[in-house]
Curated annotation (Swiss-Prot):
Protein name per its UniProtKB record: F-box protein At4g09920
Organism: Arabidopsis thaliana
Signal peptide region: none
Domain F-box: residue ranges: 1-47
Record InterPro entries: F-box-like_dom_sf, F-box_AtFBL13-like, F-box_dom, FBL13/AtMIF1-like, LRR_dom_sf, LRR_FXL15/At3g58940/PEG3-like
SUPFAM superfamilies: F-box domain, RNI-like
Cystine pairs: none
Length: 316
C-alpha cells in the first residue's frame, strides 16, 4: 500500500481507469488525497440493470451532487444504465449536459422504462462538436430540434428508441456529415413514416424491423454508397424498398418474411458476398442447371451467395 501511495496522481488515476467506476469512487474514503482522484477519470459508467429502487435513489443523489464537480477536461466515454422509472427526465438531462460540457466523445444510454414519451436528451447534445459515438437503447425519446449538427459523429446506434414525430430520424441523419456506421432497431409501434437514409459518408447500415412494429405506410429509402448492408425484416406488413446508389457494396445479409425478395435482391446487384434467409421464396424461384465451369463473363464481381431455406422435415 505504501508503494501505491507514493505514486504520482496521474499514475493512480490510470490505475483507477481499469476498475469499474463504482469501485473507483469507493477509493475516495481511503484518505484525503484519494478523495477526488476518481473525478479525473475520463471513462464513466453509472447504473445497472440489477439495481434496486434504493440503489437508484442513491445513484441519483450521488450524480446530482458530484457530476457537476467532475474535473476531467474531456470525458472519453459516459454511460448510463437506467432500468427504473423513478428518475426525473430533468435530472438525466442535467447529467448529459455536464458530459457534453466536458467535450464528450462517446455517450451510451440504456433505459428500460417504456412509459409515456419523456425527453431525457438536452438540446445541447444535438450540437455537440466532439461527439463521435452515440448509442441509445430502450425508452429514449428522439426529439431532434431544428438546430442540429454533429460534425464528428461516426457511429450511431438506435435500439428501440421512440421518435417524437415523423422525420426526426431523417433530420438527425442529414446533419451527421461524417457518419460511417448506423444501426437501427425498430422495436415498437412508433409512427416513423418513411425510413430515409441519404448519407454520402455512410459505410455500414444494419436495420432490424420487429414483428411488433405497425408499419402501415412505411417506406424504406436508401441512397448511400454502403460497403456493408444488413436487413432483418421480421414484420409481416409488406412495405416497399427503394434502394439505389450502392456501387461499393461488398457484403449484404438479407433476412425477410414478407418483402418482395426478388426486387430487393435485384437492387443490390453490385454486392460481392450475399447471404439470404427467407421463409418465402415463391417470388424468387428461377431455373438452375449446374454448369461444369463458370464463364468468366458471368457476374464479374460476384463471389459467393449462401441461400438458406427452411421447410418442414428438411434440414437447412
Amino acid at each position: 500500500m505504501d508503494r501505491i501511495i507514493g505514486l504520482p496522481d496521474e499514475v493512480l488515476v490510470k490505475i483507477l481507469s481499469f476498475v469499474p467506476t463504482k469501485v473507483a469512487v469507493s477509493t475516495s474514503i481511503l484518505s484525503k488525497r484519494w478523495e477526488f482522484l476518481w473525478m479525473w477519470l475520463t471513462k464513466l459508467k453509472f447504473g445497472s440493470k440489477r439495481y434496486s429502487e434504493s440503489e437508484f435513489k442513491r445513484l441519483q443523489c450521488f450524480l446530482d451532487r458530484n457530476l457537476p464537480l467532475h474535473r476531467a477536461p474531456v470525458i472519453e466515454s459516459f454511460r448510463l444504465v437506467l432500468s427504473d422509472s423513478h428518475f426525473k427526465p430533468e435530472d438525466i438531462r442535467m447529467w448529459v449536459v455536464v458530459a457534453v460540457s466536458r467535450y464528450i466523445r462517446e455517450l451510451k444510454i440504456y433505459s428500460s422504462h417504456y412509459g409515456e414519451k419523456q425527453n431525457i436528451l438536452p438540446s445541447s447534445l444535438y450540437t455537440c462538436k466532439s461527439l463521435v459515438i452515440l448509442k441509445l437503447d430502450g425508452g429514449v425519446l428522439l426529439d431532434v430540434p431544428r438546430m442540429v449538427c454533429l460534425p464528428s459523429l461516426k457511429t450511431l446506434e438506435l435500439k428501440g428508441v421512440r421518435y417524437f414525430k415523423q422525420g426526426s430520424l431523417q433530420r438527425l441523419l442529414c446533419n451527421c456529415p461524417v457518419l460511417e456506421d448506423l444501426f437501427v432497431l425498430l422495436l415498437r409501434c412508433d409512427d416513423i413514416g418513411m425510413f430515409i437514409v441519404i448519407v454520402p459518408s455512410l459505410q455500414r447500415l444494419s436495420l432490424y424491423l420487429s414483428p411488433r412494429c405497425n408499419l402501415e405506410g412505411f417506406v424504406i429509402v436508401l441512397d448511400t454508397p454502403l460497403e456493408y448492408f444488413k436487413l432483418v425484416d421480421r414484420n409481416y406488413d409488406r412495405h416497399p424498398y427503394m434502394i439505389e446508389n450502392m456501387p461499393k457494396l461488398t457484403s449484404a445479409y438479407v433476412e425477410v418474411i414478407s418483402a418482395d425478395l426478388k426486387s430487393l435482391v435485384e437492387s443490390i446487384t453490385s454486392v460481392k458476398y450475399l447471404t439470404i434467409f427467407s421463409e418465402n421464396y415463391d417470388d424468387f424461384v428461377f431455373p438452375w442447371n449446374q454448369p461444369s465451369t463458370v464463364p468468366k463473363c458471368f457476374c464479374p464481381v460476384y463471389k459467393s451467395s449462401p441461400v438458406y431455406k427452411s421447410s418442414p422435415g428438411q434440414n437447412t
